[in-house]
Each structure stands twice: as C-alpha cells, then as structure tokens.
Design a protein with these regions (language model features):
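Short Lys/Arg-enriched alpha/beta "domain-start" segment
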Residues: 36-72
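Short helix-initiation/N-cap motifs at beta->coil->alpha
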Residues: 176-188, 313-329
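Basic- and aromatic-lined ligand-binding clefts that recognize polyanionic substrates
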Residues: 131-144, 245, 249-305
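C-terminal motif of bacterial Sec signal peptides marking the signal peptidase cleavage site
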Residues: 24-26
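His/Asp/Glu-enriched short active-site or ligand-binding loop at hydrolase and phosphoryl-transfer sites
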Residues: 296-320, 342-345
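A short, structured surface patch at a secondary-structure boundary
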Residues: 92-193, 197-204
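Structured C-terminal subdomain patch of bacterial secreted/periplasmic proteins
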Residues: 48-53, 229-258, 337-413
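Bacterial lipoprotein signal-peptidase II cleavage site
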Residues: 28-36
Length: 413
C-alpha cells in the first residue's frame, strides 16, 4: 500500500475503532446526587460509581468524619445507611441505587463546611426540618408509619387524591399545601414556603429539567426507589429512610420490626396452587403486568397463590422498571387459563363489572377466571398502603381461597 493510500484510509480506520469502542462499552449516563457529575455503567446490574464511592468514603475520613455503624438491611437492596460522627454529632450517609449520595445532618449541625468541601458529591439533607415537598405519593404511608406527617409541608396531589386520612385532613386544614404535580411544581410556592426537600419517584427522571430547577433553587432532591424492591418487606424497610430523614428513627425502626414479624407469619399461609394474573389496563386497553421479580408477585406467593408470569422480564435491558407492556395476544396466551385475575385500578380507575371488562376486549369472555367469576379489582388506596403489606397479603389470601376480602380487593359481578 502506498503512503498516499495509507493517509486516506487512516480517518476511516480511526472512526471504525471509535465506533467499535462505543458499541462494546454499551455505556449509559446516569446522574449522581449532584447537578454536574456523571458516572458510567456498562450494564444495568453493574455496580454504579464503585470507584467514586470509595473516593467519597476516603474523603469523608480525610475531612474529619468518623465512620460508625453501617446498618444491615433485613430485606431492602436499593439503599444503605452508615452512621458518621463529627463535632460530637451523629450524621447519616444514605446511598440510594449505588450512586445517589445523601448526608443527613442534625438540625443544629452547620452544613456550610460540608457543602464547601464536597460540593456536588453529596446532597445535604437537614434532619427534621419539615416543609418537605412530597411528590412520591406512594411514600406517604412511610410518613404515616413513623408519625412524621407533620414534616410534610407540600403535596404534589390534591386532598381528594389521598387515601391516607391524616394527609387528607392536613391538606384540608392547610397544614399541607398543594404545590403542583411532580412534573410541574409551583416553584414560587415551594421557595416562599421554604421547602427543605423534594421527595420524588423515579418519574422525575423523565423530567430532568424539573429536578435541575429545584436544585438551582436550593431545594435538595431525593429520588425514592422503594417500589423497585423485589419483596413487600424490602419495600416496607424504606420506612427507615424516612424515619432518619424526619428525626423519627426509633419509631420507624420499631414499626418495621413489628411489621416484619407479621409478614413472616403471613409466609406460613396455606399454599393453594392457584394461578393469579395481576395486571392493569390503560385507556387504550393495553395490558401492563409486573415482572416476575417485582414485589407484587412475591405478595401473591406469600398469599398462597402462584403468579401467572413468574419468568417475565422487562425486554428493555436498560430499564429498571418493574412493569412490562404486553400485547393482548401475549397476555391472553397465559391469562386465559389462570384461576384468578386481579386488576390494578389505582391509575385508570374502577372497571366496575365483568360486562364492562368484556366490553373492553371480548377475549376476556374466554378466560377461565372470567367464566368462573374470579375477577377482582384493587381498592383505590392499595398503592398508598405500603405500610399495611401484611394486611394486603392476608386479604389476597382470602380471595385466593374464595372468601370475601376485608378491604383491598373487590370481586367484579
């Protein structure tokens, strides 16, 4: 090959090498707790920010923080908490999803030095400061569980949308004010009301501009991943996070320990061998089911049933979402022979009757559960009742056994 030919081929070779590297890396960019830093992960299950985490721990030690107890979670896998000491005060390093780093500081601890030393590496949360903007509505039950309703100052939903009576009453009495939905918050109301923290669900990741705006206004943002846990007790353990944040640690830990024992008792319920399909229908009658590793299938198993889609996974390997969209044809192949159907109505509302269900799609009429009259829908408050998981499982066991549910499920006639 001539020198001239080699010179012309080099750019193409270089571009091919770059393309190959990018293809093999399969990198995705995920935000850390700060506003500018990013970490990279090769696979969705890979450890996120491991090297950065080690550097952070080393930096904490260098800056005079003495590491104490790391709490051993009983079931939860999406958060960790470690105690630290500085100036005689106890602080808590909360790590969520391996890359969101929060330092929870006592109300009387000066955070100026920490903010200067760590910048975007840590999100600072002042413990028990109140005026929390709760935009992750499923977490309301955790505040109820640890007696921390008074720490909520703002809500992303209106009183009528709360199933938790204490929150509904607090909003009616103007103790908690509506401050806009998570995707369009009332920034002026939040700043005027001195919001101390925004607690968001992972939906905020679809509106990154909102998160950035809150941070620029000086409102720290914490993203909750409790619904990504694979068992009800793991999801319930997140009450500890909210107990620490609000200064109600003892109440939270005591509540979890008591409820965990109740769930352990529930695990002894009789196994029936009956199959259960748990799903929802959107406005276009598309079917949404839970992946086999989600906490809902785990609850069905504890209730004595067998989940109809135990091996189902999200086809998007980059997604952590526990929900999977199915074509009706694919859903029908499995669901037509299931013994029991449970329809999640927390988003789209009540189906009302079997005839209304079959009107949505005539193929429902050919399904065993429909023919046998074993179709149920969830109550509106089930999504906001993570702190009552043991009661939900017991209620689920009742309907699997052919008995009437006490609260959380209603048979369609």
């Amino acid at each position: 090959m001539s020198q001239k030919t080699r010179d012309h081929s080099m750019p193409a070779v270089f571009l091919l090498l770059i393309s190959a590297c990018l293809l093999l890396s399969s990198c995705s960019i995920l935000p850390t707790s700060g506003t500018k830093q990013y970490v990279y992960t090769e696979q969705k299950k890979a450890s996120i920010g491991t090297r950065n985490e080690k550097e952070l721990l080393k930096k904490l030690s260098t800056n005079g923080f003495t590491e104490g107890t790391t709490y051993q979670n009983t079931a939860a896998t999406h958060f960790s908490v470690t105690e630290y000491k500085k100036y005689g005060k106890t602080l808590y390093l909360l790590v969520i999803e391996g890359n969101q780093n929060y330092l929870i500081c006592p109300f009387d601890f000066s955070t100026d030095e920490v903010k200067k030393d760590f910048g975007d590496e840590l999100t600072i949360i002042n413990q028990g400061q109140g005026n929390i903007y709760l935009a992750a509505t499923a977490c309301g039950s955790f505040f109820r569980a640890c007696n921390a309703i008074d720490d909520i100052g703002f809500s992303s939903i209106r009183p009528a949308d709360w199933s938790i009576s204490q929150l509904k009453v607090a909003m009616d009495n103007k103790q908690i004010r509506f401050a806009g939905k998570y995707s369009a918050p009332d920034y002026e109301r939040l700043t005027d009301g001195k919001a101390s923290l925004a607690i968001e669900s992972t939906m905020i990741l679809h509106t990154p501009a909102v998160r950035e705006k809150l941070l620029k206004l000086g409102i720290p943002v914490m993203i909750d991943y409790s619904s990504y846990e694979s068992t009800p007790e793991a999801r319930l353990e997140w009450v500890k996070v909210y107990g620490i944040i609000t200064g109600h640690k003892n109440e939270a830990f005591r509540f979890f320990n008591e409820k965990y024992k109740n769930i352990e008792k529930v695990n002894q319920l009789e196994k029936t061998g009956k199959s259960v399909a748990y799903f929802s229908l959107d406005a276009e009658n598309n079917v949404v089911v839970r992946s086999g590793s989600d906490y809902i299938p785990a609850m069905i198993e504890r209730a004595g049933g067998e989940y109809a889609f135990p091996d189902l996974k999200n086809p998007d390997s980059d997604s952590h979402s526990p929900t999977v969209n199915l074509s009706f044809e694919d859903f029908y192949k499995t669901a037509r022979d299931t013994d029991i159907m449970i329809i999640n109505t927390t988003i789209e509302g009540s189906i009302g009757s079997l005839s209304s269900l079959t009107d949505r799609n005539s193929l429902f009429s050919d399904m065993k559960a429909v023919r046998d009259g074993n179709v149920y829908e969830t109550s509106a408050d089930i999504y906001q009742s993570a702190d009552e998981s043991d009661q939900i499982i017991n209620d689920m066991h009742r309907i699997i056994k052919g008995k009437k549910a006490k609260k959380y499920f209603k048979r369609l006639d």
